[in-house]
């Protein structure tokens, strides 16, 4: 399983900004950094970790042949510093398009399971305004368990929590308005507390 392989390590140059560092080690040559590169002082016992999200597109394949369509993706990575300015690169997840390219709205930490560690939350949205008669965004939050042994993993473990499904916030083609309950990190954290986490 990929989640149990060792993570790749990369050297961060002296004085190199977090943006230049993650741009230099991007996973796909055509990838662009999406949003802000986050360098977090503390996540449980991990200090100065970096979170980066890369947007890219790939040609679609059907039955082994190109289908003439391009699909967009956003890949998330966690970079954990080790000794001598080296960083372990751990894959978070891929967020595929849902009618549009995923946009990472928020990266946050909250308790989402029964242990004391805070988990990683990633809130994504997808613009739906390109569909005739529809105006708004789809929202989905993803949770990932805190990696207790970072030297033995290459991918974060996702956590499923009931009640945090895809939600539409906007107006559908019948003119009906929907409001997403969980379209901000603050609302998600409040619900996690209500659930007893």
What residue ranges belong to the model's regions?
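Short consensus segments that form the blades of beta-propeller domains
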Residues: 56-71, 96-100, 128-136
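Solvent-exposed serine/threonine-rich low-complexity stretches and specific carbohydrate-binding patches
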Residues: 89-96
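Surface-exposed loop/turn elements that mediate protein-protein interactions on large endomembrane-trafficking
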Residues: 78-89, 145-152
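Acidic/hydrophobic-patterned starts of short beta strands in beta-sheet-rich repeat architectures
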Residues: 44-55, 111-124
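N-terminal "first-domain core" detector
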Residues: 12-81
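Acidic, small-residue rich beta-repeat scaffolds with periodic aromatic anchors
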Residues: 2-40, 125-197
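Repeated scaffold domains used in trafficking and secretory/extracellular systems
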Residues: 102-107
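A short, structured loop/turn motif at beta-sheet edges
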Residues: 109-118, 146-152
């Amino acid at each position: 399983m990929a989640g149990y392989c060792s993570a790749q390590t990369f050297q961060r140059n002296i004085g190199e900004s977090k943006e230049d560092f993650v741009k230099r080690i991007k996973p796909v040559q055509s990838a662009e950094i999406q949003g802000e590169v986050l360098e977090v002082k503390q996540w449980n016992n991990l200090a100065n970790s970096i979170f980066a999200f890369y947007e890219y597109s790939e040609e679609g394949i059907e039955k082994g042949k190109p289908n003439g369509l391009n699909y967009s993706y956003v890949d998330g990575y966690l970079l954990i510093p080790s000794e001598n300015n080296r960083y372990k690169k751990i894959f978070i997840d891929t967020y595929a398009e849902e009618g549009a390219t995923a946009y990472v709205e928020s990266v946050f930490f909250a308790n989402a399971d029964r242990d004391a560690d805070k988990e990683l939350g990633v809130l994504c949205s997808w613009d739906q305004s390109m569909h005739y008669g529809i105006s708004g965004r789809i929202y989905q939050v993803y949770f990932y368990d805190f990696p207790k042994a970072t030297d033995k993993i290459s991918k974060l473990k996702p956590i499923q929590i009931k009640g945090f499904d895809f939600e539409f916030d906007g107006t559908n083609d019948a003119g009906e308005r929907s409001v997403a309950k969980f379209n901000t990190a603050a609302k998600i954290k409040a619900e996690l507390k209500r659930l007893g986490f």
